[in-house]
Amino acid sequence: MKTVLITGANKGIGFETARQLAQLNYFVYLGSRNKEHGLEAVKKLNDIGITNVETVAIDVADINSVRQARQELETKISSLDILINNAGIAGDQPQDFATGDVENLRRVFDTNFFGTVQTTQEFLPLLKKSGQAAIINVSSEVGSIALRTETGRNTNRDKYNTYGSSKTALNAFTVMLANELHDTGIIVNSVTPGYTATDLNQFQGAKTPEQGAMPIVKLAIQSDPGITAKFFKDGGEVAW
């Protein structure tokens, strides 16, 4: 049974991703900043007959927490097949660069970018032991430079410059790490769930968490080692 770690998996898209992968016979570790919330999420899955799940406490913005999570998993598994970097925060409004709060920007980057980087670094040795592993970074179209500069662009995305720039950085990390790991058997890709109703956007998204999880799951279960350094959405690729 392949093993998966999903950060931010006690609710929303992360929880739905965990549910769907567990139903496909993956063993899923649900990462949660709060251990109790993680246990509650596991119970919800147990209550519907899903038992191939456990929780692990991990705050991706806290390196000590990340290391403790890695040490915990090392006592349970010899390798990790899939790491899904899902944990993220939206940040406060306003998010314009001209006058926005730099401390807000730092907080968002600490989780969405630096948190992803340090989590990936800590779990990379376990991923390398898999033989064929995948790192999936959950991104957003608001981080796409191509969409931000296209003719007739959606100016509504300008409301999310703090969040969006953290995802732009995340996408750069995806490409550069994929290039670094090209001969290791580890593929690295970004994926956007789309505008999904979660607490990240006060449940205003058009998609359900179940729908938002689908492109993540699709990417997780594909086995083509040549698919790396790409940015996916439901139904295709996204321009960087």
Language-model-derived ranges and their functions:
Residues 35, 56-69:
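The beta1-alpha1 cofactor-binding region of Rossmann-like NAD(H)/NADP(H)-dependent oxidoreductases
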Residues 168, 183, 190-191, 198, ...:
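C-terminal helical subdomain
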Residues 89, 93-109, 128, 132-182:
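Catalytic loop of short-chain dehydrogenase/reductase
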Residues 1-29:
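Canonical Rossmann dinucleotide-binding motif of NAD(H)/NADP(H)-dependent dehydrogenases/reductases
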Residues 50-52, 72-85, 91-93, 101:
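A glycine-rich helix->loop->beta "capping" turn
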Residues 84, 119-123, 127, 173-174, ...:
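Hydrophobic positions on the long internal alpha-helix
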Residues 24-40:
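Conserved glycine-rich Rossmann-like NAD(P)H-binding loop of the short-chain dehydrogenase/reductase
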